[in-house]
């Protein structure tokens, strides 16, 4: 399989550390609000990657975190913890907020046929792991204590800008006016590993540590969870493209300084979902969720179909007109598949030929739009019987996950008929 590796800025042959076995870590949601469909594009893409790896023969061990503490509004060390903001907004405890939005996120994943990973671990379940890593970073001189907080010293890691491909001057951007910059750091890009009450005295989630009662920084959480469950050598790390800096950059720095060697070989990032106002974002106040799409009469899998028609690394433009078109195509495809009837033995040669084409498309940097083209070619091919077509659809759908053979997923009403026939 070939994948675009953000670390090297090129498409490369994927070679795992252990033949036939892939260790894959994916950054999970910060559960302070509903996930919008832009967030969910990333999880759809990660789901496709995992299923594609399995389709072409790999065993995959995938881990995802749930960020329920430590993620600041500014994505660095600036502003308040997002969980604290949500707690104030909803007049609930941070734990109640996290539990509710984790449940909502899992429900959205189910509606989009995004498989729940083998291991899903909330950040708050792994405090001892973070303390162990931070202690070693301090002992080895990669971190320092300032105003009671522990920070990673980015000047001690000479490959700090490798993932982003930029330098300090490029990354010095204006700070949002509503966010107070952390003045305890020695250097602008140093980042928090552990915060004590000198950072926020109203933080609800706190734990004892060698440096005082407090809570972990956002970046240490993913490193700690990944190393705990997947070990010291990671094959693939995924996330949205805005995680390249600072989140994934900081993960690499602290992980490699802690381990003393390269940590992850392939970094796979997914493009934004853009609407008429640019990147879809919670900070803008209004955003689309799966529930909103359902309220407007859309099948969530029409959105998955839309994502499958695009290249994962590029931005995807969203509008209701575009989604209308995707839903029409999806429903026509599903109706065509459901019209197929078993009519004899499977043609093994034809099956293997199309199966290999599908694998080739997946191996070509997850070319899912080509996968859909191959599916349509199967349905149009008059030289193969319908039993063979059904078997191919069934296998292809282990990756596409569009419920193409599930009749109970079809809504039969006048609006649907209108959409299909337009």
Model-derived features with residue positions:
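Short catalytic-loop micro-motif centered on adjacent basic/acidic residues
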Residues: 117-121, 237-239, 383
């Amino acid at each position: 399989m070939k994948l675009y590796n953000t670390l090297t800025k090129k498409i490369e042959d994927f070679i795992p550390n252990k033949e036939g076995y892939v260790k894959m870590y994916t950054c999970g949601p910060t559960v302070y609000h509903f996930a919008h469909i832009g967030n969910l594009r990333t999880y759809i893409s990660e789901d496709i990657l995992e299923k594609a790896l399995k389709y072409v023969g790999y065993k995959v061990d995938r881990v995802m975190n749930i960020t329920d503490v430590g993620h600041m509004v500014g994505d660095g060390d600036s502003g308040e913890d997002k969980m604290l903001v949500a707690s104030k907004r909803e007049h609930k405890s941070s734990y109640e907020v996290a539990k509710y939005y984790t449940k909502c996120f899992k429900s959205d994943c189910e509606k989009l046929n995004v498989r729940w990973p083998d291991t899903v671990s909330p950040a708050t379940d792994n405090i001892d792991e973070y303390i162990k890593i931070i202690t070693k970073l301090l002992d080895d001189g990669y971190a320092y204590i300032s105003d009671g907080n522990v920070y990673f010293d980015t000047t001690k890691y000479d490959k700090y800008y490798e993932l982003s491909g930029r330098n300090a001057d490029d990354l010095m951007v204006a700070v949002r006016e509503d966010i107070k910059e952390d003045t305890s750091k020695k250097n602008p890009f140093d980042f928090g590993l552990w915060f004590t009450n000198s950072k926020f005295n109203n933080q609800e989630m706190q734990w004892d540590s060698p440096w005082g009662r407090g809570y972990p920084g956002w970046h240490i959480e993913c490193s700690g969870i990944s190393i705990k469950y997947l070990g010291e050598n990671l094959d693939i790390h995924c996330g949205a493209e805005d995680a390249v800096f600072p989140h994934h950059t900081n993960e690499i720095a602290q992980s490699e300084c802690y381990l003393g060697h390269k940590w992850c070989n392939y970094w796979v990032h997914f493009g934004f979902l853009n609407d008429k106002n640019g990147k879809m974002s919670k900070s803008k106040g209004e955003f689309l969720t799966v529930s909103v799409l359902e309220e407007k009469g859309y099948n969530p899998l029409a959105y998955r179909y839309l994502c499958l028609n695009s290249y994962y690394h590029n931005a995807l433009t969203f509008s209701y007109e575009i989604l209308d078109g995707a839903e029409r195509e999806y429903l026509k495809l599903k109706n065509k598949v459901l019209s197929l009837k078993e009519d004899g033995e499977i043609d093994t040669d034809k099956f293997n030929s199309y199966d290999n084409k599908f694998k080739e498309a997946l191996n070509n940097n997850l070319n899912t739009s080509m996968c859909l083209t191959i599916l349509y070619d199967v349905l149009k091919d008059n030289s193969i019987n319908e039993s063979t077509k059904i078997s191919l659809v069934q296998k292809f759908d282990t990756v596409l996950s569009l419920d193409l053979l599930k009749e109970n997923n079809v809504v039969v009403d006048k609006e649907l008929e209108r959409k299909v026939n337009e």
